[in-house]
């Protein structure tokens, strides 16, 4: 992809903005059913896996979340929320993640970008507010 803006938006479909990953809060995890993984297989965290070898696990997890038995864990990357692709394997512990969401400072992140040698830096600096509206803030629950 030659256009830096298009490149950034394509990457953000599956990857967080640098410094804005919910995993960095320490409250979010990616989860799979290890007992379903064939020997030698490397998990890719894809929709195909969720609808294949991990389907029984994700069906069970969906039932637990929907019935309020998930102990504060929720799926944040779901269809129709923001522009990131759904990630049924990604769970957030909301009681703690909400604390970090309140402390998140977009201007601080912008300052870090301005001082860092990072690919597509101009796009990130010029469009960070709009990118955050699509790729960060929709997932703050």
Q: What does each of the following model-derived ranges do?
A:
Residues 1-140:
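Cell-envelope/glycan interface and biosynthesis
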């Amino acid at each position: 992809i030659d256009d830096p803006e298009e490149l950034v938006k394509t990457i953000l479909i599956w990857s967080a903005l640098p410094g804005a990953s919910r995993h960095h809060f320490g409250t979010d995890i990616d989860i799979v059913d290890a007992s379903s993984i064939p020997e030698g297989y490397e998990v890719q965290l894809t929709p195909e896996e969720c609808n294949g070898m991990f389907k029984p696990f994700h069906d069970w997890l969906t039932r637990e979340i929907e019935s309020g038995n998930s102990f504060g864990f929720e799926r944040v990357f779901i269809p129709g929320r923001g522009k990131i692709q759904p990630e049924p394997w990604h769970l957030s512990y909301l009681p703690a993640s909400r604390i970090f969401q309140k402390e998140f400072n977009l201007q601080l992140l912008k300052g870090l970008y301005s001082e860092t040698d990072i690919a597509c830096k101009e796009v990130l600096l010029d469009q960070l507010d709009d990118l955050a509206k699509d790729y960060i803030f929709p997932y703050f629950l």
